[in-house]
């Protein structure tokens, strides 16, 4: 990953990338992140898998705009004029395309006494928890 970012940095910016770049599977709504404290970059592998190398390269350019402007002591945030100009110059993406959402599986529970229905992402220990309305016994329903 770091080698690819170094290559893009030299080809598109004419400057070296001297730090590290990593894949980060926990990223959901963003294509990448720049960390000013230690100057490393994180990238979302889902963007690469779903949209391919062309879109991913534009996201790498976007994060490298943050990186190089920070190193030069210029405005590196999205609202700064220097950032917007450099991003347009290197043909980086302003916004990340939406990744298709992963379907979340829910667990359904109902109360035996009052019939109250609960929907939860995480499983509930049926021996430990009861209905919040009538304190009746919960059962798993499908």
From Swiss-Prot:
InterPro entries xrefs: SprT-like_domain, Uncharacterised_SprT-like
Keywords assigned by UniProt, alphabetized: Cytoplasm, Metal-binding, Zinc
Reported cofactor(s): Zn(2+)
Name of this chain's protein: Protein SprT-like
GO cellular component: cytoplasm
Organism expressing this protein natively: Streptococcus agalactiae serotype V (strain ATCC BAA-611 / 2603 V/R)
Any GO BP: response to stress
Keyword Acetylation: no
Subcellular location: Cytoplasm
Residues reported in the UniProt entry to bind Zn(2+): 62, 66
Residues annotated as the enzyme's active site: 63
Keyword match Metal-binding: yes
SMART domains given in the database record: SprT
Chief place where the protein resides: cytoplasm
One Pfam family here: SprT-like
The record's free-text note on cofactor binding: Binds 1 zinc ion.
GO molecular function terms noted in the UniProt entry: zinc ion binding
Assigned protein family: Belongs to the SprT family.
Domain SprT-like residues, every copy: 4-138
């Amino acid at each position: 990953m770091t080698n690819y970012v170094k290559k893009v940095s030299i080809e598109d910016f004419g400057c070296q990338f001297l730090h590290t770049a990593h894949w980060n599977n926990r990223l959901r709504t963003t294509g990448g992140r720049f960390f000013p404290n230690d100057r490393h970059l994180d990238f979302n592998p889902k963007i690469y898998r779903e949209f391919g190398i062309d879109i991913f390269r534009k996201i790498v350019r976007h994060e490298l705009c943050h990186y190089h402007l920070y190193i030069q002591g210029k405005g590196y945030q999205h609202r700064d004029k220097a950032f917007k100009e450099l991003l347009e110059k290197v043909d980086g993406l302003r916004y990340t395309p939406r990744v298709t959402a992963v379907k979340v599986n829910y667990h359904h529970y109902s109360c035996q006494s009052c019939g109250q229905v609960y929907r939860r992402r995480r499983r509930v220990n049926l021996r430990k928890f009861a209905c919040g309305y009538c304190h009746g016994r919960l059962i798993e329903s499908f």
